[in-house]
Amino acid sequence: FLPIVGKSLSGLSGKL
């Protein structure tokens, strides 16, 4: 997976 995708998933998880 690309680093951007990983960051996006991490950001969403953090928001939730």
UniProtKB/Swiss-Prot annotation:
Record's GO cellular component terms: extracellular region
Annotated coiled-coil segments of the chain: none
Keyword line: Amidation, Amphibian defense peptide, Antimicrobial, Immunity, Innate immunity, Pharmaceutical, Secreted
Localization of this protein: Secreted
UniProt key word Secreted: yes
Domain of life per record: Eukaryota
GO aspect biological process, one term: innate immune response
Similarity-based family: Belongs to the frog skin active peptide (FSAP) family. Temporin subfamily.
Function: Probable antimicrobial peptide that can stimulate insulin release in INS-1 cells in a dose-dependent manner and without increasing the influx of calcium.
Protein name: Temporin
The organism of origin for this protein: Amolops loloensis (Lolokou Sucker Frog)
